[in-house]
Structure formats: structure tokens, C-alpha cells
């Protein structure tokens, strides 16, 4: 896979270019450059660790939006088996901005669904860049109710800039679809685990984000509005997005400190896109243990604990 580097990763990119140049030279003649390549690789790893240990909130937001960031389909392929996609809300359309269906996790049936932004231009347009419309949320709710009926746990992957704000979506009652999902998910009698893998934008994320366990990846973000949007409103200047990101507390660490999520999962060095297999492996182990624990909780107690979890958010002494 071709690597893409963000602006703050420029020193890492320069070192990688030197390493690749030495590899090409070494393959063209009999000069042994393995020691020099190994030295530069060690230096590159050290530099990467140093840069990523002190990222600013705005830089983390850029990581959450990285064009190579793993998407729902990447995790489905690596974590689950026997995935059978289910389409449509049975009222309007196939609803492709959210992908979902039945699968198996270690042989056990689960319902898995999540935002899908798309990777190439044609797919991005088809997926509406991962911005769900009312039909996507109604489709998601249909699948979750099916999971409840067949006693399957639900796993959701959240990665969206927000719910689609188009006229058509509003005409089809976007706010009602989101509100209905919030209400229904708080009462669905089956374990629900929600994972924020990239950016989680406001109600568009919450509509599939009410669960028994809420998990964020290390370089994911959760916010009521994008940093650019916040800066445009407060300072009438989108270029102040960095300042807005710092003030909003959108990073996984800050969200965890505020007790809005249950845990933060460390990513491979340089981000989840650097080693998708390892990231998926970590999530698979975590999902396995969390679902095993949740299945042992009586359903009535599970629903009460879920309700109390969200009612406690934002409470002050």
C-alpha cells in the first residue's frame, strides 16, 4: 500500500524516502547497505514514536480523517467470518452509507454495522462519504431489532463527519430518525458494543452509538461539531480550527477523562492505517472479552445499566 503522510509527518516521510532510495541502490548493485538501512529504520521508528507521543488535538483530528484510515469493511473482513450483508430500510432505499449484516465472531452469531465512507471516488459518492440519511438510520434500527429478536449481540463501528444535512434528508425527517434510534437503542434487549474508529460527528454518530460499552481508538475524535465548524461560528474564521479543537476536548483521552466512553484502545505506531491487521486483532480480542462479559448480565439489568450510564453523563455534584 502506498503511504500517505500528513503535514506534521514530514520528517518521517523524508526518512522513509531515504530508506527507499537506499533499498533501490542496494538492489541494483552488490553494495551491502543493510546496516545503514537498519540504522535509518530504527531512527524512523524513534522519530515516529516521538512525534505521535505529543500530537495536538487538531493533528489527532487529521489522523481520524486520514484517507487510508481503516473503514468498517476492513474490520469486518478481519474480525468476523461469514458476513452476510443486509440492505435497505424497507421504506426508501438500500441506504449504503451504513453497511450492516449478520456475521460470526469466533463462531458466535453477531449483528455488525457501521458507517462506510468509501475509498475511491465512485464509492465515496455511492456511500455519501459516510454521512447517513434517515434511511440509513432506519436500516440500522431494523438490523438491531432483528438482532434482538434472534438474541444476537450488536457491534457498531462509528466513523462519520455527521448526519447528512441535505434538503432531501430533512424532508424525510432526519432528526426523527436519529431520535428514534437513540430511544430504541437504550431499550434493545441484547448486548451492544460501539466502537469509534475515526471521527464521530454529533447526532450522526450517536444514532448508532448508544451501547453497553463505548470504545474509542487512540486517534479517533468525538464532537458535537467539527473544529472547522466551531471556528467558523465562534471566530468567523475556519483557519482557527486548531484552536477550536484544543478547546472542544474532542480527543479520545479527553473524552475518556470526562467519563463519556469506557475505554481507549491504543493504535499501532503511526496510526491504525499503518498496520490494519494488528489494529483489527486488538479489536477482536477486546470484542471477544467484552461480549462474553455482557452476555452474562441478565437482560433487564443490562438495560438498566445502559440507561444509567447515559443518564449519568454530564451530571455534576
Curated annotation (Swiss-Prot):
Main localization, broad class: cytoplasm
GO cellular component term, pick one: acetyl-CoA carboxylase complex
Signal peptide: none
The keyword Cell wall biogenesis/degradation is assigned to this record: no
InterPro entries given in the database record: Acetyl_CoA_COase_a_su, ClpP/crotonase-like_dom_sf, COA_CT_C
Top EC class for this record: transferase
Domain CoA carboxyltransferase C-terminal residues, every copy: 32-293
GO-annotated biological processes: fatty acid biosynthetic process; malonyl-CoA biosynthetic process
Record has Coiled coil as a keyword: no
A GO MF term: ATP binding
Listed Pfam families: ACCA
Protein's pathway: Lipid metabolism; malonyl-CoA biosynthesis; malonyl-CoA from acetyl-CoA: step 1/1
Subunit (UniProt): Acetyl-CoA carboxylase is a heterohexamer composed of biotin carboxyl carrier protein (AccB), biotin carboxylase (AccC) and two subunits each of ACCase subunit alpha (AccA) and ACCase subunit beta (AccD).
Cited function: Component of the acetyl coenzyme A carboxylase (ACC) complex. First, biotin carboxylase catalyzes the carboxylation of biotin on its carrier protein (BCCP) and then the CO(2) group is transferred by the carboxyltransferase to acetyl-CoA to form malonyl-CoA.
UniProt-listed PANTHER family: ACETYL-COENZYME A CARBOXYLASE CARBOXYL TRANSFERASE SUBUNIT ALPHA, ACETYL-COENZYME A CARBOXYLASE CARBOXYL TRANSFERASE SUBUNIT ALPHA, CHLOROPLASTIC
Similarity-based family: Belongs to the AccA family.
Protein name: Acetyl-coenzyme A carboxylase carboxyl transferase subunit alpha
Taxonomic lineage from the root: Bacteria, Pseudomonadati, Pseudomonadota, Gammaproteobacteria, Legionellales
Originating gene: accA
